[in-house]
Amino acid sequence: MRRRLTLIGAGALSLVLFGAGAFAADGLARTRRVLYNFDGDSCLATRAGGKGPVAVTLDDVKRLIEEVAYEGSQVDTVLVCVNAQVMYYPSTVGTLRGTQSTPAERARWPASEAQRFENLQRFFAKGVDPYAVMLSETRRRGREALLSFRMNDAHGNDFLRTKFWTDHPDCRLGNGALDFGRDAVREYVFRLIEEAVRRYDCDGIELDFNRFPTFFKDVAPAQRVAAMNGLVERGRAMLDEVGRGRGRRLVLGVRVPSNYGRTPPTLATCREVGCDLAAWVKSGSVDFVVVSEFMFERYDLPIHPWKDALPGVPVYGGIECTEGGSRALYLTPEKYRRAARCLWQNGADGIYLFNFFTTREYEADAFEPPFEVLRDLGTRPAAVPAP
């Protein structure tokens, strides 16, 4: 901000400061009792009552939002993930999911991936963007509609392979991830984020550093922080530019990197991998922070230290959908409520749900997620004082 102010006259200074203040107030004042993250690939291979991969219709896509943003639901914010190294839409910057796979690899795809690829191809061939529909339905129902962007997905599947990965072997970190120590990687990732924000009529974007929390190969911590600070600041400036054109502040949220479940994430462990949350909040770049585990629910996530260190922005606590890797370990309604109580007691400003819908991915053994808990997870227990 200081560098920008040296370039404008005194008459414009008050306007810039007033605009920034108005933007900040709008971004921070919003209530988010429950934030619901949609994995953009999973929701395009299953549907309500499905027992396996199915052809998804436009009505199915709209129903995805109806299921979580129904009357009485406490879901105030819906996040739609549109990438995992690949993009889930035809991109001029990146690679559409599955298009870099060879015919031999496609022949080995599981039925779920084959159906997902077919669904995406069919929608876009007809000129229908299912993610634009999801965001539009979310806003029509009066909810905040955000994109979610996985910063460095490392699943490593062939259908997540990108042209950038193929063309830049020097930028690889392993198993599909990229080395953010490379200028070319940070430029590429920024351009992907910018493309998504400009493409979709969204209220902002979440940068998901928890998918996956590895970013650098052989760079010292201070250099990691400087590199990531530059990327986040650039993202904030881009959002402000786009937001001015849309007449509203576009939100920037961050889901912090975990420790792969070894220990709960802390500000120190995040900074070690390049994510200086305190600096991002202090600079005004970030509007909210999500703290969560990696994959499995532990019921012990401390939020108070984050609240103490990051005054001025809400800190939300994430619930993982399962206690382990089997169908039997998915959270029951009571376990979701237990997890929410723990987060509220530990200082959370709201509840964040990730992979909630993945019970539908068990094909013949698929079952519906407990949508009924969306009515109460966002209620702060009476015994827990408001911040």
Regions found by a protein language model. Name each.
Residues 2, 6-80, 84, 386-387:
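Mature N-terminal, pre-catalytic/accessory segment of carbohydrate-active enzymes
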Residues 37, 135, 139-157, 206, ...:
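Aromatic-lined carbohydrate-recognition surfaces of secreted/lumenal glycan-active proteins
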Residues 44, 59, 83-88, 124, ...:
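Acidic-and-aromatic substrate-binding clefts and catalytic sites of carbohydrate-active enzymes
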Residues 28-57, 103-136, 140, 145-199, ...:
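Active-site-adjacent "subsite" loops/lids of carbohydrate-active enzymes
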Residues 324, 341, 349-387:
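Aromatic- and carboxylate-lined catalytic core of secreted/periplasmic carbohydrate-active enzymes
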Residues 75-124, 214-217, 288-293, 304-305:
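Aromatic-lined carbohydrate-binding/catalytic grooves of carbohydrate-active enzymes
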Residues 224-231, 250-298, 327-340:
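Extracellular glycoside hydrolase catalytic/binding regions
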Residues 59-88, 199-204, 285-291, 343-350:
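Catalytic domains of carbohydrate-active enzymes, especially glycoside hydrolases
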